[in-house]
Structure formats: C-alpha cells, structure tokens
Amino acid sequence: MARVKRGVTTRARHKKVIKLAKGYRGRSKNCYRIALQRVEKALQYAYRDRRNRKRFFRSLWIMRINAAARQHGLLYSDFIHGLSLANITLNRKVLADMAVNNQDNFKQIVDITKEALTKSRVAQ
C-alpha cells in the first residue's frame, strides 16, 4: 500500500484558518493553534449575533414607532391595534422608516388609526 502524505491538505486547512484570522492581534493571526481557537470563537459570536441582530432591530423599530406615535398623542399598543382595525398591513420596519423620514405620511396613518379606534369604541 502506498504511503499517503498529507502535507498538501494540512497546508490548505492551515491557510484557510490563517486567512480567516487576518486582522487579529498578536499570535492569533499567524500561529495556527491559537488562530483556530480565535476563529472558532469568532464564528460562534457571528452565529449568535446574526440572531440577536433581528431582535435588536425589531426593538429599535418599536422604540421609533412608539416615540413618533406619542408625539401625535397615541400609545404604541393603541397605534398597532388601530392599524389592525383599519386593515393597514405595514410592517414595523416600514412604519419606523416613515416615522423618521416621512412624518407627514406617518401623521396621516396615525389619523386613520385614531379614526378606526374611535369607531371601534363607539361600536362597543
């Protein structure tokens, strides 16, 4: 049976890890064993934070919508409830963008939701 030399695959694997560790400080950028640990930890952080980013942005959108709705005399929960009553299906990302960049359009939506809320309260 022929002898298998694994220098090529080892070098390729090491190069891949060292390439991922580019920009790290100290021996973390050029010592394979240390770089491997740092890269594995970095990939764990990246995996975790891809999920955390979704939570963070949703909460940011909610804060922006809440602040803009309160400027027009409406609580966030009432505003969202009024949107569902008025059959407005804009998501929070779009609403937050409107609250920051298109305040006139956001004001019109707030007026529509206020109207829908008063109609539902009168009906009860």
Curated annotation (Swiss-Prot):
PROSITE patterns cross-referenced by the UniProt entry: RIBOSOMAL_L20 (PS00937)
Keywords carried by this UniProt record: Ribonucleoprotein, Ribosomal protein, RNA-binding, rRNA-binding
Keyword Repressor: no
InterPro entries: Ribosomal_bL20, RIBOSOMAL_L20_CS, Ribosomal_protein_bL20_C
Disulfide links within the chain: none
Pfam families reported in the protein's UniProt record: Ribosomal_L20 (PF00453)
GO molecular function, one term: structural constituent of ribosome
Gene3D superfamilies linked to this entry: 6.10.160.10, Ribosomal protein L20
Signal peptide positions on this chain: none
Any one Gene Ontology BP term: translation
GO cellular component: ribonucleoprotein complex; ribosome
Family classification: Belongs to the bacterial ribosomal protein bL20 family.
Function: Binds directly to 23S ribosomal RNA and is necessary for the in vitro assembly process of the 50S ribosomal subunit. It is not involved in the protein synthesizing functions of that subunit.
Protein name as it appears in the record: Large ribosomal subunit protein bL20
